């Protein structure tokens, strides 16, 4: 089932039985229908947990993960102790951009998943842009 964002919000407000995880799944499915990564422009997928943030650059045509990075990486942990800050997310975005430029990936499609473009998700995108990636 494909729902528009407006329909999802109506469902969330009207139907209290719609669980938060189900709502996130519906939002994720609507985004995946619109965002596809190709060989020329792979998809940058972001996952946010309470403690850390993870990102992957994915080629959807071949179903391969090209590059992955997280705030658990040693180089980021040495600079910033916790992975739940925007500074750690920004550093991770810059590191991801460096790794992708080594593999000659300059243009990507940003997939924020079910999360709002705010806070740590925005910090990853800003760090990747500062590192040289084009969205």
Swiss-Prot record:
One of its GO terms (biological process) is translation. GO terms for cellular component: chloroplast; ribonucleoprotein complex; ribosome. Keywords: Chloroplast, Plastid, Ribonucleoprotein, Ribosomal protein, RNA-binding, rRNA-binding. Gene3D superfamilies: 3.30.420.100. One of its GO terms (molecular function) is 5S rRNA binding. It is found in: Plastid, Chloroplast. Pfam families: Ribosomal_L18p. InterPro entries: Ribosomal_uL18_bac-type, Ribosomal_uL18_bac/euk. Disulfide bonds: none annotated. NCBIfam families: L18_bact. Belongs to the universal ribosomal protein uL18 family. Binds 5S rRNA, forms part of the central protuberance of the 50S subunit. HAMAP family: Ribosomal_uL18_B. PANTHER family: 39S RIBOSOMAL PROTEIN L18, MITOCHONDRIAL (PTHR12899), LARGE RIBOSOMAL SUBUNIT PROTEIN UL18M (PTHR12899:SF3). Part of the 50S ribosomal subunit; contacts the 5S rRNA. This is Large ribosomal subunit protein uL18c. It comes from Phaeodactylum tricornutum (strain CCAP 1055/1). The gene is rpl18.
């Amino acid at each position: 089932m494909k729902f528009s964002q407006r329909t999802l919000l109506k469902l969330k407000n009207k139907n209290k039985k719609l669980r938060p995880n189900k709502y996130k799944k519906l939002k994720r499915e609507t985004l995946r229908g619109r965002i596809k990564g190709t060989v020329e422009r792979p998809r940058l997928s972001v996952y946010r947990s309470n403690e850390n943030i993870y990102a992957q650059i994915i080629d959807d045509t071949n179903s391969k993960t090209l590059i992955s990075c997280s705030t658990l990486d040693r180089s980021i942990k040495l600079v910033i102790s916790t992975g739940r800050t925007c500074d750690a997310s920004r550093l991770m975005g810059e590191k991801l951009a460096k790794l992708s430029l080594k593999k000659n990936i300059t243009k990507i499609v940003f997939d924020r998943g079910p999360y709002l473009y705010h806070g740590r998700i925005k910090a990853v995108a800003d760090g990747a842009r500062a590192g040289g990636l084009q969205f």
